[in-house]
């Protein structure tokens, strides 16, 4: 049965129980009989059924309630009783069955007479007892339903129908009885569970008192209505709370609509009392008012609990008065006097109630106005109470007065000349005027008392405002902000100035009179009164005595500036306006302006705007700015254009933001200035100056009196009765006012200037605070409390003797102005002057209020009381709402006790016995729970456990405590975790990380006999390895009783933050089973811990810590409580807790910090690495600065990055302590998110579908190790592993001097390499196997990237980037898995957005341009901040799933793919000796970094697009129709169709990404605010522009600023500086040619002409460069091969094959040379020197020489390498070579394809160790020169060999 039908059934019963005719009938037939009660109930049920029959017959309600039908139904009842009941032997049984059937059909519950009159025991079972079964509960509830209807009726009728009392106590007792009646059968149970229930009246009184205080006690004398209204509303909520608690605890089987029964019964008796006893014509109004009360209760119930009074469950809502007022406003809008039947009809929307209801105030005023109208109908006259309340509460008058008092106190404590005080006064005056206008516009009678109050306060504010106008300070001020409009005549500059000023005043909440229009021709500032805005129209058009330009020099400055005033009384006016707006036809200063330095004038204009008209738009008088265009210009010549705004709104936003930024800078500037020291002499001079000023506007009679009677005295100040004259020696003469013989005009002048003079003296004293601090620090108390009397002595009001002495020690002139100030703003009460006015108003109105209130009927009182309860009871209702969320468990009892208990007990705990450092947790002070009266000890060990274990799981709006477990898992209470829906996005918050992941129920593991569940996921952060040692798993080994500590970390909704709490426990091992109950959930556990401590809601998951064997350990998690005794479940054991940690068989040794250094949720420093496991991180740059003449006078915008802390380039700067490691790791501080799962899934599915469509003909399976190592020959994008890079960790620890990276683990020649090291092979296998079940541990080395960076990123804001070196074994495992996929992504860049592998010199660049231009030429170019640091695990998982889907992986293969990829997102990072734990981001050394970054880039943009058009499926699902996109890592270009560009644009992307924690800026101008559409020619991609050539092709031109740094710094680590420089020059030639061949030719000529050492043939010719680009454009040569041939022409293969010798030869006895491919001997027969080929040797059997090739050197190394490592005496190679010679072995030199390198090496080594005379080396090398012409450099470079 639906809720409306149930409501109607209740209505039938209510009417039936209220019929006197039925009562009389039953009394007549069964009076005094045992069946009387049953018969009465049966009669009511029978009559209600008859009413239902009439209703079902579709009779109108008027017809159902007509006298005809009432008589008809009574006849049926009487007939039924006479025929079927009176003489029936089984009458009672039949009546019970009838009643039971009705209850079952109407309310789904039973009725039983046997339990009707019985007294029921408590439902709380005794020990050994059992809970009643549901059948018993249903029987009792069925009875209680009827008892409720009777008891409520009787209780309220007894209290109200007699009308003997209308007291608050009587009404609240009535409510208490009604609540008891609603639960009469269960009262013992409720009273046993809730101790506060018996004190409910006091609770309701306390709440009503608190609400009355919030209303500023305005209802004194008539507060009864508030007490009754709040009592009724709150009682309805309490009934609903108790009912839900009984249902969830299975005491009753389901909700029975108790709030409805309670409320309708209460309203029924009130209705019957008043509607039947009053005149008929007023019954309609009474019914409306009672309907208003009912609606108020139901509205509060629905807002708090998501539940109507009828009992229907709805979504839980957040309590707030605004939504409830809307409901009430909707109700009263339908009130009409035509008929009662209009009540309850469907009401219109809120917009139909009253136009302009846009705020809480408007709705409150509207409801009050309707109540006033209804009250006038009931009372016959307009209600003064409601009229006054509508203004006091609706207009927030009390709060406004309170603000005025706060401002007044601020004015007395700080300088009144401060601009912020002046503006605040203006704001309060404007607010007061608005309130006064609201009073005058009220439709009902204007409340004269309130109007008088507001007017009085306004007069005082205006007096204060006028008094501080002349208080402008002669001190440093904020520089005003100047806005300058320029443009031709007639473009509407004046209009935009006026609109800009009006908008600024509105935004700053200032009145329209705060604008001063400056007349440039007036030498005086006539009319200037420190207005906030100054405007200049036609600035500089007409020269005056002082030009406008010259005037601005002093006005727009931070120096004090006194303006010229015509009136003597206004002399000393200082300028401190905040905004200057000028309009002029001239952009520059007038040459005749007298400004000698035009730049000084120009830089004072903060924003310069040129106004012009749009050609295609006509002028609209209604919107004069609509046809204007605004161009933002530089303020200085040549006035370059900065931006263009097409609308006024855009301009206004820019100007206001610029203004606020300017004000903030000025505020910081003023706060940095020192406070000047002032002397007494200066103070006296200032006081004389004040006297001169006050004398200037004092009446002549006062001045003349001083001259005649007080020689040497100065007029100082006056009060209402006295005039004070001051002598320079300090004396003050007091003259009564009547002696002055002043006329009325003079007295008015004295009165008007009195306050102004007093404030000037007060400000002067504040400027000299060190002379007499008392007058400054205690001025507020002295003035407000009137502690100085008219005779300038301490008054009787000052009772403190010490303070009296201090006041009397003040100079008399100070006492004089303090006394005068008291006369203006003193208050006799502790409250301020303004609130005291409110008290006077209340006092004057109280008697009339009480007189009127006596005539109010009860419905009107209840209506007003319930409405005020909603306005003022928000805190109470929020508390009740918090109880609703926990009413399903035992913690409800404790929570209810804390809310319903009045007052608080004093804790009797010992003071803490540890210092404060131990009582902070995550930078928050720990709140102590003093349960046992002991001081808890929270030591370092417990803090470590809490820090690493305690976490919070956030599921939508719910939060629960969980405990991090070893590995990637957490423990939590099962009754919460099991309820989390599958597939929702949740967040795990620890002290260091925030991780979003999708909940998978399959990963939740339950343990037998435990309430704790374990959730394991590879997405979770990894807990410390040592955590498992801090868990105690064996409950049996614990003592029976032991002390413990209870630790929680819960979110406090009031404080809006997490609060740590700690308490002492005395734990016991339980001897009986525990049944954990949560809603329908039941779970019995036999093993648990108990402690008699009253835990509260949200404690589940709290940590129970105890000292075990001298060490603090976690013994359990809190899982349940019955309000008095808590229970904890022991920590369950899981085999995965002891999974071996570390990378393969290596376990890093480090000292773990007790408190890690947290950089953010995604990264923390966890400890210091042991010395034996520490590796060096470099620190020396490979860049060499070239000689100055080599730099060719080209600018250098980039220099080498900072590699180590303490770089000399930063010495003496603010960045001297810059640490590149510490700062670089901050990029991993926080992952992006959260991502909505459905949208993310849809986006990833669409990308995977695109892959499938493009995958035809591609293999995706894994490759073997050989292919992963060597690549596949002649297969594009299948390159070999780069062996010159680092081998990673831990292999780096084993590297010996002279050994190189990965190469030392590889043997063979390129293309045929193999790994023979067993450790590497075993580690590769380990990664492949362990990743099938879990995420492997990964140790990575962080190195600072040695690169050239912009100067600002090196000197001003150092931002060195980190490069991450991953283990070689892991990289190979990844290559085996993904190499085919990488090739697919790079190969299909023609259809995929990812452009990795693009050749910018080929036609591929043009294809990118054409793809983008297909959607139009509106392109977004984005740049991300810390892109490789924010990759979240949830997206890495999605990428892994997408790969698995396209490959077709299942089961273990899918898990392996996911875990391998997640390993790089969750790793250990080694930064020198500091070890970091990183939980997001992607390391730069990951083999798939650029691919994954590209996919992430694509996902982010498509996800943003999907969310942008989430509700528009026709656009949302067709990304490629409206958008074209290319990505390369974090670079992207997004071409957007014009059809959607208004919505999907740069502003949307910036804001959307910001919500995900991602900062996006313009990719071209990274300092620009926002992202705007660009044309393709203006876009950057891979630092290249798009240039369209004459033939229609496109070139990727690189900006020249990226080229010139190559002339300043070269990388010469592997080659000589000159060789590297030549290579850089050739690279510059290639790039310059793309932009202009002429520039390339000019650059080549310049290099040759200025650098004589550069041989022309070593530079590429222009024709060679042109040929190179032609070949690239036509795709004839791969890019790398073409570059290699161009730059190393002498290394090209011989024209005739076989020209170089390749066979093994014995060139001397025992000396052999050979080539790799043609050697057929046995290496065991030789001592081998292997040239460039990786080969491992046994000790004493040879060595290898690995070197970089020199440019054009015939396969030999550079000259520097030969000199240092071959020819130099005592070098390592010579030593190893001599050892081989001394053993008498045959010596074999072997090189790769030819014997020539081996031959030359052999000769040079023999000569260097003196085994070969110079003559023979000459002959041998000359022979080699004859065979290989490329060795022609040898005689020149090595003359000692010839």
From Swiss-Prot:
PROSITE patterns, sorted: PCV_3C_PRO (PS51874), RDRP_SSRNA_POS (PS50507), SF3_HELICASE_2 (PS51218)
InterPro entries: DNA/RNA_pol_sf, Helic/Pol/Pept_Calicivir-typ, Helicase_SF3_ssDNA/RNA_vir, Helicase_SF3_ssRNA_vir, PCV_3C_PRO, Peptidase_C3A/C3B_picornavir, Peptidase_S1_PA, Peptidase_S1_PA_chymotrypsin
Active site: 975 (for picornain 3c-like protease activity), 1011 (for picornain 3c-like protease activity), 1100 (for picornain 3c-like protease activity)
Domain of life: Viruses
Keywords linked to the UniProt accession: ATP-binding, Covalent protein-RNA linkage, Helicase, Host cytoplasm, Host endoplasmic reticulum, Host membrane, Hydrolase, Membrane, Nucleotide-binding, Nucleotidyltransferase, Phosphoprotein, Protease, RNA-directed RNA polymerase, Thiol protease, Transferase, Transmembrane, Transmembrane helix, Viral RNA replication
SUPFAM superfamilies in UniProt: DNA/RNA polymerases, Trypsin-like serine proteases
E.C. designation(s): 3.6.4.-, 3.4.22.-, 2.7.7.48
GO molecular function: ATP binding; cysteine-type endopeptidase activity; RNA binding; RNA helicase activity; RNA-directed RNA polymerase activity
Membrane-spanning segments: 883-903
The keyword Phosphoprotein belongs to this UniProt entry's keyword annotation: yes
Domain RdRp catalytic intervals: 1417-1544
One Pfam family, short name: RNA_helicase
Catalytic activity: RNA(n) + a ribonucleoside 5'-triphosphate = RNA(n+1) + diphosphate
GO annotations of cellular component type: host cell endoplasmic reticulum; host cell membrane; host cell perinuclear region of cytoplasm; membrane
Domain Peptidase C3 positions: 935-1137
Domain called SF3 helicase: residue spans: 458-626
Coiled coil: none
Positions bearing O-(5'-phospho-RNA)-serine: 909
This protein's name: RNA1 polyprotein
